[in-house]
Amino acid sequence: MSFLVELARGAYPDNALNGFTASSQFGLDNARAMMWLSQLAYETAHRDKVKSILDAWHLTMPAFIANDPATGLPPRSACVVVAAGRGATFVTFAGSDPLKFEDWITDFNAVQSADDLHRGFADAVETVWPVIQAAIANRPAPGEPLFFTGHSLGGALAVLAAARAAHEPNVQTTVVYTFGSPRTGGSAFFNGYALGNSTFRLINGTDIVPTVPPAQPGDYRHVGQSIQCPTDGRFDGAPGQISAAAANKPDIIDGAIAAGLADIRALAAFRLIRRIGPRPLDRLAGALPRMVRDHVPANYFRALSITL
């Protein structure tokens, strides 16, 4: 990955995962732990740095896939860190890096595959699946829970990988946390997805990425339970029962209207442009439209009451 999406080593607290429990129920402490793991996947250009952070978190690293482009046309890519410990195995995918060409190809290859998946996302998971499959089969305690997570593109890849992992031997519990994830497949994938009760889709404010690919045309659907907080708000509780129609929100037009109204309120309060986080990407995002600002990882950390 590039400097735009990385954090300094000292920004990763040693106690980041101390609130984690290997539960399939939604919990804010688990969401915070998954957000830290999602951020860690952005560090795959620095294997030693990732290993150092995992050591501090009392986790091992059974598998690591850096950001070298995969072979084949069009280029496909996925960056993955598999970690183990604390009673679970974690599979975390990196999101899109603005400076990484193959990520843009993955994102925009939105033609649906024969099995009703976003082709770019499905191809990226296929590229790394043998490594993930081996890590699952060889995890320290057979049958221990699997947690899949990722921000942005990483969340979409986490959903598709979790759906595959659920069919592996000795996999009883699979939990998914995503942050600002796009839609991943059509109605057939939605209807066959068996992890809806343990898939938690967090959306910050008017984040534009969960609105794409559009629900129409193409019949793209979200899966799992939606947890959304307002712009500049906080995630503060468990998701309620959500209908299939509501779960496919947000809509890009509704989001654009909400973002515009929020910008008007912010302008009136003299806070339209504000510091978001410590990275170059965060500083750039401060001047971008709200639907983009709400997507950056720093704003998900803030919404989870984590100070970077």
Give the ranges of each region predicted by the language model:
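Non-catalytic, mobile gating and regulatory segments of ester bond hydrolases
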Residues: 1-149, 153-308
